[in-house]
Amino acid sequence: MEEWTLLFVLILSFAAAVIMSPLFIPFLRKLKFGQSIREEGPKSHQKKSGTPTMGGIVIVLSIFISALAIGIAITGFTPELLLLMVVTLGYGIVGFVDDYLKVVRKHNLGLTSKQKLAGQLVIAAIFYIGLLAIGFDTFIAIPGTTFGFDLGWLYLILIVLMLLGASNAVNLTDGLDGLLAGTGSIAFGAFAILAWSGGFIDTALFSTAITGALLGFLVFNAHPAKVFMGDTGSLALGGAIAAIAILTKMELMLIIVGGVFVIETLSVIIQVASFKLTGKRVFRMSPLHHHYELVGWSEWRVVVTFWLVGMIFAIMGVYIGVWLT
């Protein structure tokens, strides 16, 4: 498979997002699908209230346009490609329902945590059944080494934890203009390189499609954002990156490449644990990006800094996965 196919998929998904976004944004405004802003959030965010949300639909559509091109013209519809499409669409649907309820209720509360968890578990179960059907092994490799271990039936628990953890971690990161679109494109770009070097061609192409879709969406999501991706986009991306890590047998690499998402999640865990145990908060606000806003950083400065940190994690992951393995 020639490298030009990666460029073709990248350009196709980027173009799809760039073309569809300006058509979709007025449609969202007409339907009054505006974002509700939490009252307890940073005061500077109140002016964003009403900004069109559910832009993740554009991201998912752009990914699927490219995925269809991959399936029809490049690799065929392999089981791995179909599983990636199912997980991305499934988590995107859960996010869509959540976003829709928020818009209809005019409040930043959509699905309950139990309802969202149930939806995520159903998709995880479907994914696991799909893995069993293709004879997927349960061996875990330690990045950068020749060591590993077989989890056996415990692999099911790992899959559930990865899909739930990644989807929620990515969702937490979507709090500033361009933050998730930028860090996400970096992480998926890294996985595209890792998958390609490991011979997982269809997964590499799918990762590239997501990278292109996010870069195209970033044109309209960068500060000041004209549209937000909402849970439709963030949950789809979280599910996708976990599925990619699993299918490429780079489960532990997700912690490195997705380092920004891990840090954001840890900041929330630390904040909640500290407040419950001591009654004091470690950060001004969590997730971490809000803390930096409240200490005086501009939104754009926070976003660019997180992009740079994401690049460092991505470079580390590619170095370990390609050159040390």
Swiss-Prot record:
Pathway: Cell wall biogenesis; peptidoglycan biosynthesis. GO terms for molecular function: metal ion binding; phospho-N-acetylmuramoyl-pentapeptide-transferase activity; UDP-N-acetylmuramoyl-L-alanyl-D-glutamyl-meso-2,6-diaminopimelyl-D-alanyl-D-alanine:undecaprenyl-phosphate transferase activity. It is found in: Cell membrane. GO terms for biological process: cell division; cell wall organization; peptidoglycan biosynthetic process; regulation of cell shape. The chain crosses the membrane at residues 7-27, 57-77, 81-101, 122-142, 146-166, 186-206, 227-247, 252-272, 302-322. NCBIfam families: mraY. This is Phospho-N-acetylmuramoyl-pentapeptide-transferase. It comes from Shouchella clausii (strain KSM-K16) (Alkalihalobacillus clausii).
